[in-house]
UniProtKB/Swiss-Prot annotation:
PROSITE patterns per record: GST_CTER, GST_NTER
Binding, glutathione: 8, 39, 43, 49-51, 63-64
EC annotation from Swiss-Prot or TrEMBL: 2.5.1.18
Family the entry assigns: Belongs to the GST superfamily. Sigma family.
A GO CC annotation given for this chain: contractile muscle fiber
Induction pattern: By paraquat. Induced by white light exposure.
Domain spans labelled GST C-terminal: 81-207
Protein's name in the database: Glutathione S-transferase 4
Function: Conjugation of reduced glutathione to a wide number of exogenous and endogenous hydrophobic electrophiles. May play a role in the detoxification of reactive oxygen species produced during pathogenic bacterial infection.
GO molecular function: glutathione transferase activity
Amino acid sequence: MPNYKLLYFDARALAEPIRIMFAMLNVPYEDYRVSVEEWSKLKPTTPFGQLPILQVDGEQFGQSMSITRYLARKFGLAGKTAEEEAYADSIVDQYRDFIFFFRQFTSSVFYGSDADHINKVRFEVVEPARDDFLAIINKFLAKSKSGFLVGDSLTWADIVIADNLTSLLKNGFLDFNKEKKLEEFYNKIHSIPEIKNYVATRKDSIV
């Protein structure tokens, strides 16, 4: 078994699907939380000047979705066929498109923007993008006979999207009373015993 070390800030955000995957598969790894002070020194040593970084036996890999996809392929969660892999990849790509808008909100909150600006971003930027994004996810779920987004078993797309739904819930962008199909999906993924146990004991954050 390779030696894995995941480096990211002390938050869920872009690294959490990686952590969930490791936890679900009981793969040992070091979950290293980088402080703001450490980051200024560490940044020049990283491949892209960004976190997360996954170290595998000393080799450094960057870009969160590339890392997650790499592990999904390695651990059999990328899809059972080339077509399933393409569907899973496309769902995650759509998620990345949405995150561009969502991060405008979380950044505004993090950096202490005034309430008027935060509300403007919420209502004029994020909510329209959220509506489009969730409509697409609902279309995949409507076609699914298994309750998973792709095929008849869990893929990395399920892990990524379910974790993003957590962030939407925590920030007031999702109401399961109005999104029953998404609630069923969310509960299905979070009822997987290993994921359920991990989520119950992890250090939480709003993103």
